[in-house]
Every structure is written in C-alpha cells, then in structure tokens.
A protein has these predicted regions:
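Short S/T/G/P-enriched beta-strand
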Residues: 276-317, 325, 332-337, 369-390
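Residue-level hotspots within well-ordered secondary structure
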Residues: 388-515
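Extracellular/luminal low-complexity segments enriched in Ser/Thr/Pro
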Residues: 298, 352-360
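Bacterial N-terminal signal peptides that target proteins for export
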Residues: 2-17
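N-terminal nucleophile
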Residues: 28-280
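Low-complexity "stalk/linker" and mucin-like segments enriched in Ser/Thr/Pro/Ala/Gly
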Residues: 329-348, 353, 462
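Short, aromatic- and glycine-rich surface loops/edge beta-strands on solvent-exposed regions
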Residues: 362-372, 422, 492-496
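Surface-exposed, short loops/turns at beta-strand junctions within beta-sandwich domains
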Residues: 357-363, 485-488
Length: 515
C-alpha cells in the first residue's frame, strides 16, 4: 500500500536538512529511463539510486501526460528550477535540445547535472555533465514509434545503460512491460556501484561486479516507475511537490528504504506483477477496439455512422461482459461536426454509439471513456470520422465465395446536375489518373477498362449518369459467387469524376476481396 501523502510530506520536511547537507554538493540519482510511444501516447519513466531514506520520485522526474517526460539527476534540483524548465518547455512544444540550452543559460551547476528529456514528437536528448561521478553516460534514440533517453552516473559501468536499452528495444508489450524489463536489466549489471561495488569507487569492480546476484544483492536502495497514458491527469510542478505527482496508469514508488530492505527493483517487480494481475478483465486503453463504420461520410447533416467499441484487457482477451459507463465526446483536435448519440450496451463487452454527420467538412476525433467501476479508461488512439467524403461504400469487404453488393453513395456538386462516370481499379489509388484538370484517385489497369466497358450493367449499376440537383446519386457494384476468385486479397478502389466538362473528382473508397 502506498504511504499516505501527509506522511510522505512530513518525511520530506524532516529530511530536508539532511538532503541539502548530504546531497547538495554531490547528489547522485543513478540511472533513469524515459520512453515514449508516439502511436499510443504513453510516457514511461523509471529511476533508481543507492540513497537511503529518500523519495526519488519527489526529486527527479518530470511527467507531462501525452506530451513527454524528463529526469534531472546527479546534482539535486533543490530549487525545482531545472524540472520546471523541462515542464514548461515540454508544455510549450520546445525541442529537448532547446530545453537543455535554456537550462544551461541559467544554471550555474550545469557541469554537475545529468538530464534526459523525450517528447511525443520523438525527439530525445541525454546530457551528462563532466562533473558526474564515474561511470557516467547515456544513450538516446528513436526506433520506429519508440523514442527513449537512458542515462546514469556512479554506475558499475556502461553495460547498465546498454542492457537497459536492449531491454527497451527487445521486450514485447506496452511501455510498462518495456520499462520493467529495462529496470531489471540495469539492476542485473549491478546498477548503482555504490550499492554493488564501492562507495568511493563505484565503477572499479566491473559490470556486473564479480559474484553479483541481483536476486540477493543490492543495485540500489530506492526506485520508482510511472507510466502516463492519455486520460491520466498531470499534477503540479514545483520544489514543494515535485513534478511527478499526477494520477497515472502505473505509479509504483519504493521510497524511504534502508540498506536492510530488499533491492527496490525486486520490490518493483513484486508490485508490478500484483498491479498487472489486477488489470486482468479490465478494459485496456490501447488494445480495446474502437472504429467508426463507415469511416467516412459526407458532411450533409444526415449521414449516419456507428462508433463501435469492444473492451479488451491487457492480455488481449475480450472482457466479455457489459456494465461499463460509456461517455463519448469530441477529442482535442476534432472538427466537432458530428452529433453523438446515446451509447448502447450489448452486454458482452461491446458498445455502439450512433453518430450523425454534421453540416460541414472536416475530421472528427472521439474521446471514448469506459468506466468499469474501478477507474475510467480513455481509449487511444482516438477513433476518427471523416466528414469530407464525396463517395462512400456501405461495406469494406466482399466475399469471393459468396459474392455480394457494395452500395456506393455519391455526394458531388449541388445544383448543376453534372454527368458523372464511376470507375474501379485493382492497382491502388496513387498517383491516380489525370483527366483534364483533375486527378481521379485510381491507377489505370485492366479493371478500370472493364468497369468502363461494363458501366450501367448488372455488375456496375448506375455508374454512368447524372447527379441529382442536391448533388447525390446511388450506384452499385454487384458480383455473383466465385466471380472474384481471381482477386482474393486485392483492394478494389472506386472513384468517380464529373464530365462535360470535367470539373470534379471524388475521393476513393476501397472494398477488399476476401475468400
């Protein structure tokens, strides 16, 4: 159980004089790990050090949910100015390198600092001042959707950082799994050499030190891990409360330990496994499915769609029962066009929310929150609804074995009743076909020729005609059983253009051919 906040506050006050006397000149916060995942919006931070009776989470991290994270270590940030500069810089969208330059400009102790910063744009920096105790150094990188900064001082050696990096890169699962594995990898190499080797010469024994056993020997005395997800709430940031005090998806803090307590990374693993156990059967922010069908519609004020949600837990298992309170609103960045209906609980862990397109053009994003009675879970990435469509299909796929029909709705220029021609391609949508002043988003192939020759046939119904006065029209693509057997796995793209004269080309819609 986490120590009550008022007790932690009293401890900090009681230890303030000790911290300043014993740490201000040569404070060491040993290794820290900052990871972000741009695709999920997660920010993960972990840190450990060989200091007794200390709350590392109060002094080191900066957590900005959905924005980025940082750590200030080696020389204690007693004024809070370093962490506040990171906080404000991330909030303003400043690049981590520019934030470091800002800190260097006002900090007289920059030579003794070690700082890591990563933002949600994937930019990462790791700075190690020349005054940091050996072994000291760090790495930063951007690999796919993951960016990270890992740094440490008074370590047993570079393997502490290097092996933590490999754990980040090679561990499967979400950022919580990656962070836990990276903390354990660092600890397995001895971590803070003052605990595993020598207080006066932390890097003199090797990494890991001879005979070091991470199951029984100590790599640190205190440690923390936190993961912020979209929907979590930032705390504040100043010298009295720290900058990692919000409400987070994962928040484990092993503080105020002594040399007689078990290694804090071992304690983190125990707490982590218990936390994971409690997440079984609960909706996961990221793995829960959410999609709008159809994904696009015209912004005509009447087009209907459905936002469909299925609750999935962190192991990828459907929750399987209803009962969650579902709230849906337009997310940040949404065009806020569509009207949102009342959620429908299907009783099996799936929910449907009716949508009605608004009048106008743009893309809506929806913030879906499932509250299962334990805590609210905000689903991410936000599902999108594109209200700029000038062509839609009521199906996303057709079965080659069964055949079927794709009903195609055209939404073009109003008032002029222009002639149109709808075509189909099996070769993609880009770069498309230039026709007069427009580009029709279909690549020319034999299917385009076939759709032209068979226009207004039993297969391509009403694909050559005139739009109505309101700019709408309806067409169909219909196939019998096994007629598409040779196109299994292909995407059939449809688009139309107006002609006589050519003035307009629609978007493309894709129908996948399945077995």
């Amino acid at each position: 159980m986490r120590t009550p906040s008022w007790i932690r506050t009293l401890r900090r006050l009681a230890l303030t004089s000790l911290a300043f006397a014993g740490l201000a000149g040569g404070a060491r916060a040993t290794w820290s790990i900052i990871i972000i995942d741009r695709s999920t919006g997660e920010v993960a931070i972990g840190c450990a050090t060989c200091l007794e009776n200390f709350d590392l989470q109060f002094w080191v991290p900066v957590m900005k949910v959905g924005v980025g994270g940082g750590c200030s270590q080696s020389a204690i940030d007693s004024t809070g100015d370093i962490r506040r500069a990171i906080w404000d810089g991330l909030d303003a969208g400043d690049a981590p390198l520019d934030i470091l330059r800002t800190i260097k400009g006002f900090d007289g102790n920059y030579f003794n600092r070690q700082i890591g910063i990563v933002d949600m744009q994937g930019r990462a920096q790791s700075y190690t001042g020349g005054g940091c105790g050996a072994w000291a150094g760090g790495v930063k990188n951007r690999v796919g959707k993951i960016s990270y900064a890992i740094q440490g001082n008074v370590l047993t050696g570079s393997p502490v950082v290097d092996d933590a990096e490999q754990a980040v890169l090679n561990t499967t699962g979400d950022l919580a799994e990656k962070l836990m594995a990276a903390m354990e990898a660092a600890a397995a190499d001895g971590g803070d050499g003052r605990c595993s080797c020598s207080v006066s010469a932390p890097d003199s024994c090797g990494s890991p030190p001879p005979g070091f056993d991470p199951k029984t020997d100590k790599s640190a005395h205190c440690a923390f891990m936190m993961v912020g997800r979209i929907g979590d709430v930032d705390g504040g940031c100043d010298k009295t409360i720290g900058c990692g005090n919000g409400s987070y998806f994962l928040d484990l803090n092993i503080a105020f330990q002594t040399m007689n307590d078990p290694d804090p990374v071992i304690q983190l693993r125990t707490a982590f496994d218990a936390w994971r156990l409690n997440q079984i059967g609960r909706p996961d922010h990221i793995l829960s499915t959410k999609a709008v069908t159809p994904a696009s519609a015209p912004g005509n004020g009447t087009a209907a769609a459905s936002l469909d949600v299925t609750a999935i837990d962190w192991q990828g298992v459907p929750v399987g029962h209803g009962g969650a309170i579902v709230t849906v609103q337009h997310a940040p960045g949404s065009a806020s066009l569509a009207a949102i209906g009342t959620p429908v609980d299907h009783g099996d862990g799936s929910y449907s929310i009716p949508l009605t397109a608004g009048e106008g053009q743009g893309q809506d994003l929806f913030e879906v929150v499932l509250d299962d009675g334990v805590s609210p879970v905000t689903l991410f990435p936000y599902p999108a609804f594109d209200e700029t469509a000038t062509l839609t299909s009521d199906v996303a796929s057709l079965s080659a074995a069964a055949g079927g029909t794709a009903n195609l709705s055209l939404f073009g220029p109003e008032g002029t009743t222009p002639s149109y021609l709808l075509l189909c391609s099996a070769s993609g949508t880009s770069p498309g076909m230039p026709i007069g002043p427009v580009v029709v988003p279909l690549n020319f192939d034999n299917v385009v020729v076939l759709s032209f020759l068979l226009r207004n046939s039993a297969h391509f119904v009403n694909t050559d005609g005139a739009l109505l006065a309101d700019g709408t029209q309806a067409a169909q693509f219909t196939v019998a059983a096994n007629e598409l057997a040779g196109l299994i796995g292909f995407d059939l793209a449809f688009a139309y253009f107006t002609h006589s004269p050519v003035t307009f080309a629609s978007n493309a819609v894709v129908v996948n051919v399945q077995p």
